[in-house]
């Protein structure tokens, strides 16, 4: 597991991109998120959804604070669509390379970068 390193969203985004979480396979992305959020004091539950004839799909439910009063929900997904023909990529789609100040990789904008922002803002 990669440590949070003060919640740096760049570090978190790169760590999530490096998980080859092509639908429906998780490749450790959910566990990585659970680890980070647990370190921050969240109670985390990893839920396994099963349906006959399909691959299992993991989901994460994380909660902090008491159950009284208003709640704020961050919702997202860690899976990405297949990268297609890798020869058409200028870099490894799961290497999370930083080029000219931009992070390049599967899920950088949909939606691993946003999830890293949720976590770092918490």
Predicted regions and their residues:
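Acidic/His- and Gly-rich active-site-bordering loop/insert found
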Residues: 1-108
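Active-site alpha-helical elements of protease catalytic centers
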Residues: 107-122
């Amino acid at each position: 597991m990669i440590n949070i390193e003060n919640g740096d969203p760049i570090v978190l985004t790169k760590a999530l991109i490096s998980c080859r979480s092509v639908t429906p396979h998780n490749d450790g992305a959910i566990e990585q998120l659970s680890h980070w959020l647990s370190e921050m004091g969240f109670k985390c539950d990893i839920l396994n959804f099963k349906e006959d004839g399909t691959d299992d799909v993991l989901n994460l439910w994380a909660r902090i604070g008491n159950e009284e009063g208003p709640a704020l929900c961050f919702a997202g997904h860690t899976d990405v669509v297949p990268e297609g023909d890798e020869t058409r990529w200028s870099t490894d789609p799961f290497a999370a390379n930083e080029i000219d100040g931009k992070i390049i990789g599967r899920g950088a904008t949909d939606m691993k970068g946003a999830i890293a922002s949720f976590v770092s803002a918490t």
